[in-house]
Swiss-Prot record:
Annotated organism of origin: Aquifex aeolicus (strain VF5)
Lineage: Bacteria, Pseudomonadati, Aquificota, Aquificia, Aquificales
Ranges annotated as spanning the membrane: none
Entry keywords, A to Z: 2Fe-2S, Electron transport, FAD, Flavoprotein, Iron, Iron-sulfur, Metal-binding, Transport
GO biological process: pyrimidine nucleotide biosynthetic process
Listed cofactors: [2Fe-2S] cluster; FAD
Protein name: Dihydroorotate dehydrogenase B (NAD(+)), electron transfer subunit homolog
Gene Ontology MF, one: oxidoreductase activity
Positions annotated to bind [2Fe-2S] cluster: 217, 222, 225, 238
Keyword Oxidoreductase: no
PROSITE patterns on file: FAD_FR
Cofactor, how bound (note): Binds 1 [2Fe-2S] cluster per subunit. Binds 1 FAD per subunit.
Length: 251
């Protein structure tokens, strides 16, 4: 059941680079409905400038709380970064129809930048199911790997990649694919060039993309988040996604 809330801000903390962590108070009856892949549409300010909401993956769930990570890259997220604990944000969740597959016993999660936030709830779910999980996390530099603290707290096996070599291995996070056999199911979330590279590598893995597109509504009405599919049609990321098999989409 979708819910529209005036959710209380519990935390809105700068992490590093452009990354912030936002924690909202959410009723437990709503939290119980949230599955990996679900997202929320959050209005960053109480004004009409900007008018629209912004889409954020639900990165973690705690008692009475939902956690989100976001990069500040425009007016909306800048205004969001200024919101203080105790203030309230118009929040619509849980959104997303097509969610992650749990098939297979071994799962490689590839997160690029803030895209890792789209995979963290999945990682915990798979672990709870007794699945083997490995996380590869990449960014431009050390300061763009702000979710390392989460990885360490949750004690997942992981490897870091940075373009400039300032943390972890120097290179692109997609290189990790060459080191895992094809019986590992791959889940990836991050910038479109990263996803495109994974698709072009043709490693033979079963791959699922959690897609990130700009959204105005979040429930399939505005058609602002469509992606082209191999059958020549278009699918709405918010409604026929956000998770789609790699072979379905054209990037």
């Amino acid at each position: 059941m979708l819910a529209e809330l005036n959710a209380e801000v519990l935390e809105n903390t700068y992490i590093s680079g452009n990354l912030y962590r936002l924690t909202l108070r959410i009723p437990d009856k709503i939290l119980k409905q949230i599955e990996p892949g679900h997202f929320a549409m959050i209005k960053p300010s109480d004004t009409y400038d900007p008018m629209g909401r912004r889409a954020f993956a639900v990165a973690d769930i705690e008692e009475h709380k939902a956690v989100f990570y976001y990069d500040v890259y425009g007016k909306g997220t800048y205004l969001l970064s200024k919101r203080k604990p105790g203030e309230r944000l118009k929040t619509f969740l849980p959104l997303g129809k097509r969610l992650f597959s749990y098939e297979g016993d071994k799962h490689l999660l590839i997160g690029g930048g803030v895209g890792l936030a789209g995979l963290t709830l999945l990682a915990k779910k798979l672990r709870d199911m007794g699945k083997k999980v490995f996380i590869a996390y990449g960014g431009r530099s050390r300061e763009h790997l702000g979710m390392v603290e989460w990885l360490e707290k949750e004690e997942f096996p992981y490897e870091l990649f940075t373009n400039d070599g300032s943390a972890g291995r120097k290179g692109f996070v997609t290189e990790i694919l060459k080191e895992f056999s094809t019986d590992w199911v791959v889940h990836a979330c991050g910038p479109k060039p990263m996803l495109k590279t994974i698709k072009e590598m043709k490693t033979g893995h079963k791959v699922y993309f959690s897609l990130e597109e700009r959204m105005a509504c979040g429930w399939g009405v505005c058609l602002g988040c469509v992606v082209k599919t191999r059958d020549g049609k278009f699918k709405r990321v918010c409604y026929e996604g956000p998770v789609m098999p790699m072979e379905e989409v054209i990037l």
